[in-house]
């Protein structure tokens, strides 16, 4: 496109290769490794020849193979190890027929198959116990004793003492067991008594609350009655306009009820 292409701005940071953190010797990891004898330039790993001198890089897993499958493929034992292809053993047999080594290749493939079965999921490896083999007598079908007669006598005496000690231990264990049972029963009784005591306290509190509620209800009722009686004795508040009108009506009624007042109004004289 040349100069006619669209221009795109690019901004580069101060550390485009992201190496500032690895070159910084004041970080905790750098100082911690130096305490164990590590120096810049040395690798990390079990073996110094195969140690990693560069940073650990993340590789993208773009297949459905399990973890460690690629490493297993790389570490092939021999030329007949079919780590990658499933039908490679058949191909090896065809090559063996052509080269005249069919028997050797078939034997090698059979041994590999047997080894796979043994090392598979249900394969079991039996390990002989050297201690059992050295102390077991196949004729008498008993364990061998290499001690002398004196030691046997001592062992017999020790066994008698041990039997007595075992009896004493059993008796003491029985006593301890009985004491433990009694202790458990006492604990259960104490728990029951505590529960009953708590229930009794709760019932007493509930009764007290009910009594208090009844008393408060009675006091409220009496206060309401007193307030109603006092309210009946208090006259109703009348507005000022109505009070003036009521006075005028009373005066008018009084004038109409009085005969003398009417005569004065109508100017009637009693001759």
From Swiss-Prot:
Compositional bias ranges of the Acidic residues kind: 157-168
UniProt subcellular location: Nucleus, Nucleolus
Alphabetized InterPro entries for the sequence: G_patch_dom, PINX1
The UniProt record lists the keyword rRNA processing: yes
Stretches for region Disordered: 147-239
Function: Involved in rRNA-processing at A0, A1 and A2 sites through its action in U18 and U24 snoRNA 3'-end final trimming. Negative regulator of telomerase throughX competition for binding to EST2 with TLC1.
Protein name: Protein PXR1
